[in-house]
Amino acid sequence: MTVAEKPAAGASAGGVTPPADAPNLKPPKSARRPEAPSAASKTEPSADSLAIAGLVPLSTVDWPGKLAVAVFLQGCPLACPYCQNEAILDPKVPGAVPWSQVEALLARRAGLLDGVVLTGGEALRQAGVVDAARRVREMGFGVGLHTAGAYPRALAKTLPHTDWVGIDVKAMPDDYAAATGFGAGAKAWQSLDAVLEASAERACPALAAEAADADGMVERADCMFEPAGADRTVERAGANRTVKRAGANRTVKRADVGPLDYEVRTTVYPGAPATERFEELLGELRARGVRNFALQEARTDGTPVDFRAQALAWDRRAWAKRLDEMVDAASRAGFESFEARLA
C-alpha cells in the first residue's frame, strides 16, 4: 500500500504510549523489539500522542464496501515474513503525520467518507488509539480497525468505539512463534473470541443491556435462546437502556453503539504454518462461531528480501494445487461470507 499525505514541515506526531498488555515475548534476532509498556497513566493517552507513519486519504480496500481514510500507525510486535509494511514496524521511529491532520482531513470530507480505518503496523500497540476511535465517532464517521490481536486488553477498550474489525488469524495458537516470530497465539485467539462476543452482543438489542445482580454477577439476556413466554422488553432512552424481566427493573448506562461487523482473515503461502494446518484451522474458526472469513494469498511485492528470495524456490505447480484445495475447503466450511484474495 502506498502511504500518502505527509504533514507540513516541522509537524510531529509526538511520543507514543503503548498499551498495558504488550506481549512479553522474546523476538528472533532479526526482529525489532517492541517498546516496553510504560507505567499506567491516570489519564487515558490522547490521540495526539499517536505516532502515525502516514495515511491514505481515500481507500476502497481497507474496509470492505466503505470509502475510508486509512491511518497507518507506527510499530508492530510481530515479525511476519510476508509483511508489506516493513518500513513502519520499528516502534522507535517518530510519527510523520500529526493526528490534527487526520481530523482536518475528516472535517473537509464530511459527507463524502464513510469512516476511518486504524491500521499499521499494529494499531492497538499505541494506547492513544482508544481516544482516536472515540474522536472519529464524535465527528460522525465510522471506525474500522485492523489488528492481529496481540493486545487483547487494548482491544477490549477500543471495541466499544469501533464499527468494523478486520482481525488477522495467523495460525493455530501453538504455531504463532513459527508464523510471526512471537508466541502470541493465546492472546491472538483471545482477541478473536472478544470480537466474536462483542459482535454477537451488539447484534441483539437485549444483549446490549447488562446489569449486575446483588452478588456482582452479570446477568445477560440471550436473544437466540429466549425461554418461551419470558417477560422481557427492552426500552431505549438515549444512552439509557432499561431491561424488564421477571419483575426486575434494571437500568444500565451504556455507550450508544450499533452493530459490530468483522472479518477474520488468514494469509497463506508455501510452507506457512497456516498452510500446513489449514483444514484444522478452518474447523477451529467455525467451532468458535466465525461467520465471515477471507483467505489471502501472500504477495511478494514490498516484502522483506528474505521472503522474496524464498519465493523464487517455490514449486508453483504444487502451490497452485494446494491453494485450490484451501479455497475449496474454505468455500465448503459453512461461513456466511467467504472471499478468496489471490495474488
Segment roles from a protein language model:
Residues T2-G65, R202-P205, A212-D215, C223-M224, ...:
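Auxiliary Fe-S-binding modules of radical SAM enzymes
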Residues E86-V116:
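Conserved alpha-helical substructure of the radical SAM core
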